[in-house]
Amino acid sequence: MHIMEGYLPPMWCAVWWVLSGIVIAYGIVKLKKLLEESPEMKPLVAISGAYMFILSSLKMPSVTGSCSHPCGNGLGAVLFGVPITAVLAAIVLLFQALFLAHGGLTTLGANDFSMGIVGPAAAVIVYRLCMKAGLSSTVGIFFAALFGDWLTYVTTAVQLALAFPIPSFTAAFTKFIVIYAYTQVPLAIAEGILTVIIWDYIKKLRPDLLLKLGVVPEEELKPYLTPSPAGGE
């Protein structure tokens, strides 16, 4: 989904930079506060960023002027929310633009808006809906990763169609989203399965962090929590 350097008109580069910049700035404040108040979260933040970096670096060429790849943004979004995920995505996108020729600096705002903001927002909403429906967090994280990936690409298709509405926005959007769908539908399913594996490992290894973040019900985490000396949970 990374839109390559120089592909978007300057006006659209500026628009997406401004919109993403606002969220990133807020995310930096939230991330700083989180790490100051809960320094034990640092490894989990690092894992979320690394997961996003690795998955989103596995790119396959696309004729849209972009590329297809997993996003890895659902995990961080569910754990820490959209603003912090926007910061992690910005760091990932900056490294990829500078060292992997993946994306670009002028298009970083657009790429962060899709992969660091809209996709994560979709992941958070879907995860919360799954929790309200009484589903397990494992099921919730699968669908969060799935829809986080899909909505990232829907957003990129919208961005490309807005920049190049030929012959119309609707026609351009349809063209871009159909091309993406061939690779992204199966990729998102695979990403969902991989995210479940990572999630269940975190749940078994550090259930205390998930409990502190309030993203998994205590009842679901009880089998993994270490009993106290008095025999309590």
Swiss-Prot record:
The keyword Membrane applies. One of its GO terms (molecular function) is cobalt ion transmembrane transporter activity. Pathway: Cofactor biosynthesis; adenosylcobalamin biosynthesis. One of its GO terms (cellular component) is ATP-binding cassette (ABC) transporter complex. Keywords: Cell membrane, Cobalamin biosynthesis, Cobalt, Cobalt transport, Ion transport, Membrane, Transmembrane, Transmembrane helix, Transport. The chain crosses the membrane at residues 9-29, 43-63, 75-95, 107-127, 138-158, 177-197. InterPro entries: CbiM, CbiM/NikMN. It is found in: Cell membrane. It is a multi-pass membrane protein. Gene3D superfamilies: 1.10.1760.20. GO terms for biological process: cobalamin biosynthetic process. Belongs to the CbiM family. Forms an energy-coupling factor (ECF) transporter complex composed of an ATP-binding protein (A component, CbiO), a transmembrane protein (T component, CbiQ) and 2 possible substrate-capture proteins (S components, CbiM and CbiN) of unknown stoichimetry. Part of the energy-coupling factor (ECF) transporter complex CbiMNOQ involved in cobalt import. This is Putative cobalt transport protein CbiM. It comes from Methanocaldococcus jannaschii (strain ATCC 43067 / DSM 2661 / JAL-1 / JCM 10045 / NBRC 100440) (Methanococcus jannaschii). The lineage of its organism: Archaea, Methanobacteriati, Methanobacteriota, Methanomada group, Methanococci. The gene is cbiM.
